[in-house]
Design a protein with these regions (language model features):
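C-terminal regulatory/interaction regions
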Residues: 1-26, 296-367
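Short Pro/Gly-enriched beta-strand edge/turn motifs at strand-loop
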Residues: 17, 40-46, 169-176, 196-198
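Conserved beta-strand hairpin/beta-sheet module of binuclear metal-dependent hydrolase folds
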Residues: 33-95, 215-231
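A short catalytic or substrate-binding loop motif that flags glycine-/basic-rich loops and adjacent residues
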Residues: 52-54, 185-187, 206-209, 365-367
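Metallo-beta-lactamase
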Residues: 68-78, 173-185, 192-194, 199-292
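Active-site HxH/HxHxD metal-binding segment of metal-dependent hydrolases
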Residues: 79-80, 85-194, 221
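Short hydrophobic/aromatic-enriched beta-strand-loop microsegments
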Residues: 121-128, 224-226, 287, 322
Length: 367
């Protein structure tokens, strides 16, 4: 779930409004289906559709000798392979895929990685935590939901009908992800990998996923940003039942601060969603500021004890429906856990196993 949480930005805002925020878009618009835009030397920007409100993922091809290194892949659902066939035969000129690089393990990024790797006998490149987490989630496909997961959502304030829906939907990760290769090539933070004779530096971020990789071609300032720096929306930062006391928001904010010290403002950001843009420093600052503003709103809403599901209005501009309830709950708990670890909130569990959260500040100190 990518949301408009972090800067209060409506994804449909005008280009002029966005320009006022310090971002510029060098291209007139995104590529059409089956087509590509050359955004930098030897780099193609393409799109694959997704059947949801966030209706696309950007995928990129970087010239690599006689073929292409592909960055991210789209969901393994009907129609996506057909889109890839058009891209492979069209803008990619029928040349082979030399390697598949996935920025992180979310299904829209790795869904067809296994298919592309198998078709072209190409290696898969990922960070270790992302690969291992993907393999773990794939292994859960079709399994029964653990009771610890039900308890997690009960503690957040879900009713029994909602918990039953969680049980029915558990283990669906593999429904949109083709089987991954049994081996992979690890990429590490700070490592330089050579694509087409040019160096790309791996820059890792945490919070949205465990070990998200950006790739930075420093000689001309091109950054394959994945979900780390999106132009108009903020990447989901969630706590999940597997690690209920995690602090992904702390990890996310630390990563954003680090990115500020790494990327110059004029780099060309190639994001996974939205349009290619410049203004990295401005956007990173807005993402950080937005979460701190949200934390202050959250603290003010917690003058009286509330459950995680009760704080949605303080965090989200839109109503939360069943389709995104899990991600919204995870993001709410991420903010609550952050406050708990900062000492600005307390948590008490009642006899029914429900957690009640209360602020220890007036809201101004929460962030």
């Amino acid at each position: 779930l990518e949301t408009d949480l972090a800067d209060g930005v409506n994804p449909a805002e005008t280009e002029a409004r966005t320009a006022e925020r310090g971002l510029t878009y060098p291209f007139a618009g995104p590529p059409a289906s089956g087509e590509a835009i050359r955004v930098a030397e030897d780099v193609l920007w393409m799109r694959v559709a997704m059947p949801m409100q966030l209706d696309h993922i950007n995928v990129y091809a970087v010239r690599d000798g006689d073929g292409w290194a592909v960055v991210d892949c789209g969901l393994a659902i009907p129609g996506t392979k057909d889109e890839w066939e058009l891209l492979l035969a069209g803008p990619m000129g029928g040349d082979p895929v030399t390697r598949v690089i996935c920025t992180h393990m979310h299904p829209d990024h790795i869904g067809l990685a296994g298919w592309l790797c198998e078709r072209f006998d190409a290696p898969l490149l990922m960070t270790r935590l992302e690969y291992v987490m993907a393999r773990m989630l794939l292994a859960d496909t079709g399994k029964t939901a653990p009771e610890s997961g039900a308890a997690f959502y009960r503690a957040a304030g879900w009713d029994e009908e909602q918990i039953e829906r969680y049980r029915k939907e558990f283990g669906r990760f593999g429904m949109a992800v083709a089987p991954l290769p049994a081996s992979y090539q690890r990429i590490r933070d700070g490592e330089r990998i050579v694509i087409g004779g040019r160096d790309w530096t791996v820059v890792v971020g945490e919070g949205h996923s465990p070990e998200h990789a950006c790739l930075w071609r420093q000689d001309d300032g091109v950054v394959l940003g994945g979900d780390q720096i999106l132009p108009r929306i903020s990447s989901n930062v969630s706590v999940w039942p597997t690690e209920a006391d995690a602090d992904p928001l702390g990890d996310w904010l630390t990563s954003l601060e680090r990115m500020k010290s790494v990327f110059p403002d004029d780099v060309l950001i190639l994001p996974s969603h939205g349009e290619v843009f410049r203004g990295a420093q401005t956007r990173l600052e807005a993402l950080i500021r937005g979460h701190h503003v949200a934390l202050k709103r959250l603290a003010r809403s917690l003058k009286e004890p509330k459950r995680a599901v009760d704080v949605f209005p303080a965090l989200f501009a839109r109503p939360v429906g069943d389709g995104v309830r899990g991600m919204a709950t995870g993001e709410a708990i991420a903010h609550l856990n952050y406050m708990l670890l900062q000492g600005t909130a307390v948590r008490e569990r009642d006899a029914d196993g429900v957690d009640w959260w209360r602020s220890t500040t007036n809201g101004e100190e929460a962030a």
